[in-house]
Amino acid sequence: MTRIPEIKFYTSPVYEGKWWDFRLTKPPKINEEQFLQSVNKIRARKQLFQEYLRDITRILGIEWSRKEIEVWMVSLSIGVFSRPLTLSLCWERGKVRDIDHLIDDLTHELIHNALIEHPRYSEALKLLEKDYAPEPFRTYVHILVHAVHVLIYKTKRGEHRMEWDIQKAQSNQPYARAWEIVQKEGPEKILEKYLGSKN
């Protein structure tokens, strides 16, 4: 049985403080009570995220080199990204983020982390660049991410969540373009063509 990394959730005033110190324009943030409530909601869903990670691992057919995945949660509105995996619990306008949005965004970043483990990932990006030039690099990357995420949405989250994600992406052209390609070509076809993954 394939070993799945343990997802561990962390907060760090030092990590968060560095973001605050180096920003010329100070980002919005939620207060401590709101932050702790959101942190607890995320931690309470650890087994859900472990289940999603098992599904992602199965879809990609990967073997993990890591024993754990660290997730750093911050109260600042600085976005969400995969290395180090950082989850902002605050919207741009200083509001608490909805738990459904956080679940979808964290799943997205877990997919990024899983793709990096795939032995054909670098080769796949080169082939995507060849097939979809002159699209930007961010589009190539997210074709693969969205292809995996579609399968999670359809089996775990529901298509209404996928529609929300697609709508959210419309303000970011590379993400939106990646969704267009995945919807046109189909996630299974994309994953088989570029990664050799059959689902």
Question: What residue ranges belong to the model's regions?
Answer:
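Soluble non-cytosolic domains of exported or imported proteins
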Residues: 43-50, 97-101, 105, 135-139
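Sec/Tat-exported extracytoplasmic proteins
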Residues: 56-60, 114, 118, 149-156, ...
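Ser/Thr/Asn(+Pro)-rich, low-complexity disordered segments
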Residues: 78-80, 110, 125
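Active-site recognition of the HExxH zinc-binding catalytic motif
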Residues: 100-119
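Post-HExxH zinc-binding segment in Zn-dependent metallohydrolases
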Residues: 125-174, 178
